[in-house]
Amino acid sequence: MTDAPVSRLRNFCIIAHIDHGKSTLADRLLQDTGTVADRDMQAQFLDNMDLERERGITIKLQAARMQFKAADGELYTLNLIDTPGHVDFSYEVSRSLQACEGALLVVDASQGVEAQTLANVYLALGNDLEIIPVLNKIDLPGADAERISTEIEEIIGLDTSNAIHCSAKTGLGVPEILQAIVDRVPAPPDTTEEPLKALIFDSYYDPYRGVIVYFRVVSGRLRKKDKVLLMASKKTYELDEIGVMSPDQKQVDELHAGEVGYLAASIKAVADARVGDTITLASAPAEEPLPGYTEAKPMVFCGLFPTDADQYPDLRDALDKLKLSDAALKYEPETSSAMGFGFRCGFLGLLHMEIVQERLEREYDLDLIVTAPSVIYKVNMADGSTVMVDNPATLPEPQARESIEEPYVKMEIYAPNSFNGTLMELCQERRGTFIDMKYITTDRVTLQYELPLAEVVTDFFDQMKSRTKGYASMEYSLIGYRQNVLVRLDVLINGDKADPLTTIVHRDKAYGVGKGLVEKLKELIPRQQFKIPLQASIGSRIIASESISAMRKDVLAKCYGGDISRKKKLLKKQAKGKKRMKAMGKVDVPQEAFMAVLKLNENK
């Protein structure tokens, strides 16, 4: 299986925007090379999480090895490294690109170049990959190959004279793609005799064998039973098995430079075999690791609470297990007066947060309450120290702090130019600063803005999609922290502070957000037997208030006619009871109310 000389190895990946047909093309390549028998084939073969198939997106990286007989009669080994296309997983994309020498740039022939395609193309160019443009969905009635080719040339500057026209659905053009990979993607450098260095580009947790690590051998050889050292985590392991994915795992005895494979070594947690880490031999370690390893930093935080307090231990176990397979997830215990015990969790972005939440509910059968997402703020204290705050409820008091800085992102939005006005209005509303606007083609435009991440994480994406009828796509990257006049907005329900609803907002927007919040809560909280005041406050100053009127129980129903003093007595008794109820009563706040922060812009 591994006797392929380095000169006949090709490592490549597929770059595409969501829905441009990447997974379907991967399926077709596997089928055409006979890697997967036709009878075993199922759509999105490499996306093996249910959630991936359902959403039609790639979350975890997969890899597959194919044998292809080229035009020169030689048998070539092609390694396809699948990449996630979503902005949240861009670190994972950059690692898988590092494991390749070439990339197929798949563009939908009816849609054209989109934001995420571009971001990943620039990463690929930065890694010096040979890029082969492929125009997919050429069989669609709306396909316009000429226009899209010029678009690729103008935007990315790639020569599309030899772009391949294909339809991954029907299999048209797939043999040409395989031949182009052999002809145009360079073979890996032959560094088999140098010390072992292998790049980890993915890992997942297997309950029986521990962590399974996917890697690309950059130099040297790796044999079964070798003792290896992971350079970033400084841990050593003895290999239980090594092998290749075709796409099912097949064990081999040795892998040499340029090859892609997997290893199992009874590693306990994914955090010990971090993506981007370098594997080397414990007996003869390499002098320095491969460049580009960084720790995944969570950007978006939220509270996760079980709806039933008895499920707290189950939630903790579920998070511990998820952490084994998702090194980017961070969490710590948190208690809240309104919600009881739960966890404060950190995620790479909104999609990552949604996926973790869905996996917890689906795979571990939990019912969760999720608080509104927030970002991590940098608070400069009066005594000169700096505190990082990821939970708005823990923001230090105004007198103790000097200033607050919030993370900013640089955002690029690609859209048809008829939606220019509404998109600019949206960015303006979200405290965006206009940077640049370019016409890509006569009817498509790219807008560049800098805006606070906090304004992006709530519902920016949904708003952008609904304003542009789904035509716009966006891409953002962090550009650092900036100081702003920010305040903490608390919400009081019946005089009690509701921690999960606390937010940090810009002072100019505080009144609008506060008013919107209490109005939304008035709709969402059911009426009780007593009157419930809802207030939004900054410190001790109430800036907006509403109240939910009490349900009226007619205590006079039984008095037909009769003495007025009898009625007064009953009404007085009722008033006294309500007063006591108000002092003692607890308000049941439904889950929807905690997400009210997200829904503020819905009615606009």
UniProtKB/Swiss-Prot annotation:
Q: Where this protein primarily resides, as one coarse class?
A: membrane
Query: Which GO cellular component does the record give, naming just one?
Result: plasma membrane
Which CDD domains does the record match to this protein? EF4_II, EF4_III, LepA, lepA_C
Q: What's one GO MF term for it?
A: ribosome binding
tr-type G domain spans which residues? 7-190
GO terms for biological process? positive regulation of translation; translation
Sorted alphabetically, which SUPFAM superfamilies does this protein's record hold? EF-G C-terminal domain-like, P-loop containing nucleoside triphosphate hydrolases, Translation proteins
Which domain of life does this protein belong to?
Bacteria
Question: Family assignment?
Answer: Belongs to the TRAFAC class translation factor GTPase superfamily. Classic translation factor GTPase family. LepA subfamily.
Purpose of the protein: Required for accurate and efficient protein synthesis under certain stress conditions. May act as a fidelity factor of the translation reaction, by catalyzing a one-codon backward translocation of tRNAs on improperly translocated ribosomes. Back-translocation proceeds from a post-translocation (POST) complex to a pre-translocation (PRE) complex, thus giving elongation factor G a second chance to translocate the tRNAs correctly. Binds to ribosomes in a GTP-dependent manner.
Q: Which NCBIfam families match?
A: lepA, small_GTP
What is the protein's name according to its record?
A: Elongation factor 4
Q: What is the lineage of its organism?
A: Bacteria, Bacillati, Cyanobacteriota, Cyanophyceae, Synechococcales
